[in-house]
Design a protein with these regions (language model features):
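Acidic (Asp/Glu-rich) sequence patches and key acidic residues
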Residues: 1-120
Length: 120
């Protein structure tokens, strides 16, 4: 079992409905959904320095159930449920430090750069 978190740069924190639309488009592989931003690449580098991307060599200890989905616009992580107590808080902190919005589609929650959630 796993769950997703999505990260992107946006000047203002979107509503849950807006974030859900953005997430759906990003998951569908559309580009131009949000502006590309170097903060996304910087976040990705910081993220894989803590939790390396899934590879054959680290499958047993990786928190990811599939390789990270990374573009110039977003990072989408599919996290193993067994690591749900540890990984999200680290990623939320990193995202906040890089000025990124985080969307949790399971909880329908949006986290802005303050790390505070807004939900339906």
């Amino acid at each position: 079992m796993s769950f997703d978190l999505a990260f992107w740069h946006q000047k203002s924190v979107p509503t849950v409905e807006e974030a859900a639309q953005i997430y759906d488009q990003l998951v569908d592989g559309l580009s131009g959904v949000v502006e590309a931003n170097s903060a996304v690449e910087d976040f990705h580098k910081a993220m894989i320095s803590v939790f390396p991307d899934l590879a054959e060599e680290n499958m047993d200890e990786s928190p990811w159930t599939s390789p990270l989905y990374v573009t110039s616009e977003c990072v989408i992580a599919t996290i193993s449920w067994s690591r749900s107590g540890e990984v999200p808080s680290v990623l939320l902190d990193l995202a906040s430090r890089h000025g990124l919005t985080t969307y949790d589609p399971q909880e329908q929650a949006v986290y802005g750069i303050t790390g505070e959630a807004s939900t339906r």
